[in-house]
Amino acid sequence: MIYTVTFNPAIDYVVRLDKALEVGEVNRAVGEDCVLGGKGINVSGVLRELGCESVALGFVAGETGAWLERGLAAQGLCTDFIHLDHGMTRINVKIKASEETELNGAGPAIPASALQQLEEKLDALTENDVLILAGSIPSSMPQDTYERLLARLDGKGVRCVVDATRALLANVLPFHPFLIKPNNHELGELVGRELTGDAEITAAARTLQEKGARNVLVSMAGDGALLVDEAGGVHRIGCPKGKVVNSVGAGDSMVAGFVAGYLTPCGSAPPAAAPRPSASGLPNGVRSKRCLQRFKIRRKQGEENPYAYHHIIFPQGHCTGFHRFHAGGDPERAGGAASHS
């Protein structure tokens, strides 16, 4: 089973304006949405779109927590949240105007007893399970929580995926996470230098592998993504051009796609595919299967796989190639016509 953990889930209240936000004035929206999320929940949502079962873990509180839990159940997500006695699940306000402005809630305080309940749930995980830890740690929790959880699971064979930043990510590397997914700027922070170009990004990813990471998947916004796998391979995919409607959840979708394609040939997911969303066709940023871009990567079992380009599907038919890198050589581009469904 795949388990995702969202320590501080949220209800995102997304407000759209048709002009710039005027601070200190009354601004009238032209549209609004409520999106239930948090990074781990976003991952579970994309996994569901790919036909993969998962269980979303985390903490909820108050009426907003109950509303979030009901909403996720209505979307078909399986949850096993820990219910807190005090506080309320946070509401984040996202203002979409000429520029994006965010006001994120603090969320409830998480007592040590609640964290212990989560640890006890994770104690039941085995080598057949995948654990995805994503996002920041609330200020009320120990900042070494990620380390504690991975140390607790160390030696059990659980494949741990970590999507976090700075010390949260750096400090779990000794526990050999199966996958980490920094973006290129976060990767630069981890190695202490600005990264320009694929060669520098690849070298930095390998530095993190030397520190313990098995697979390093680097998201690069409009420049696509780069994967350095545990077998030493380097794989590059571009990103189709288009108007960015909402970038929220793009990295979470990439994590979900890697897990669905690399680890579990389940449901309707292609057996060795990792998706990436097209922001131009994904109004809420995540959870739309037809907007997932797929590229083939090596399966854990080690069977023959040419890392061939796997066609992508976008609403507007845009297609981008897959670059196959060879040690010391130039990238090879493999193209293909887009397929439609």
Located regions from the model:
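Glycine-rich phosphate/adenosyl-contacting loop at the front of the ribokinase-like
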Residues: M1-L57, G65-W67, K243
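Conserved N-terminal subdomain of the carbohydrate kinase-like
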Residues: V23-E25, E49-D129, K296-Q301
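Short, conserved phosphate/pyrophosphate- and ester-handling motifs at nucleotide-, phospho-/glycolipid
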Residues: L47, N183, G251
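Gly/Ala-rich phosphate-binding loop of Rossmann-like dinucleotide-binding domains
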Residues: R48, D154, L263
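Short beta-strands and strand-loop turn motifs
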Residues: E102-N104, N128-G135, D163, K181-E186
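Conserved phosphate/ATP/ADP-binding segment of small-molecule kinases
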Residues: Q143-A231
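Conserved phosphate-binding/catalytic region of the ribokinase-like
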Residues: A170, D198-P306
